[in-house]
């Protein structure tokens, strides 16, 4: 309840100002425009997109066999995008599309990540070997291949301070048939 909020406020030394909402002119402008701000393919032609990796979760945005596919505008446009993830045809909207995405922050390559969450509709357009600098030095990207069946190694990662690494460890153990649901309960 509210008592818990006050306890946490005191524990973390948060002032009342921390909880105040500050309103700006930009907020009013954004609300006034509502859904009228639309990014079109023409906008993407000249957009120098800066993200190195773009994930698109909608139907047909990765339809590389048709003109006007959005992932192509990122890859072949004037920006710095190296890889995109898009869907070639209709895709189920009830998928957990961001499952394990945190592994990208641990140096896992885009293609390795995509392999873990692959669907028939989804594709990597661009460089599947692209990876981000890991938040801390590790060999996770290599270990996913070279230590795939090493149950002891993956069990050791269940104690990782990173939830994403723990999730990967569970996935690797499950795929290898080295852990049961009973062990987790």
Predicted regions mapped to residue ranges:
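Alpha-helical scaffolding within the catalytic cores
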Residues: 33-45, 66-73
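Short acidic, S/G/P-rich loop/turn micro-motifs used as interaction or catalytic elements
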Residues: 59-64, 91
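Short, small-residue-biased leader/transition segments that mark boundaries at the very start
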Residues: 2-6
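Histidine/acidic-residue-rich catalytic or RNA/ligand-binding cores of hydrolases
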Residues: 65-71, 93-104
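Short acidic/histidine-rich active-site segments
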Residues: 80-95
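Loop/turn elements at helix/coil->beta-strand transitions in domains of secreted/extracellular proteins
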Residues: 49-54, 78-83, 109
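Short, surface-exposed basic-aromatic patches at helix termini and helix-loop junctions that form
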Residues: 46-48, 71-80, 103-105
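Caspase-like cysteine protease fold
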Residues: 97-179
């Amino acid at each position: 309840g509210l008592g818990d909020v006050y306890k946490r406020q005191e524990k973390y030394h948060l002032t009342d100002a921390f909880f105040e909402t500050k309103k700006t002119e930009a907020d009013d402008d954004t609300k006034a425009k509502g859904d009228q701000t639309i990014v079109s393919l023409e906008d993407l032609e000249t957009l120098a997109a800066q993200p190195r990796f773009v994930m698109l979760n909608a139907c047909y945005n990765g339809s590389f066999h048709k003109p006007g596919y959005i992932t192509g505008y990122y890859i072949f446009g004037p920006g710095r995008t190296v890889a995109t993830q898009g869907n070639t045809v209709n895709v189920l909207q009830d998928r957990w599309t961001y499952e394990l995405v945190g592994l990208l922050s641990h140096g896992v390559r885009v293609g390795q990540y995509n392999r873990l969450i692959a669907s028939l509709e989804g594709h990597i357009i661009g460089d599947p070997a692209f990876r981000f600098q890991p938040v801390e030095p590790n060999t996770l990207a290599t270990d996913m291949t070279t230590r795939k069946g090493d149950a002891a190694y993956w069990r050791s990662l269940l104690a990782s301070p990173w939830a994403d690494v723990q999730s990967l460890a569970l996935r690797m153990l499950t795929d290898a048939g080295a852990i049961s649901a009973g062990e987790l309960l």
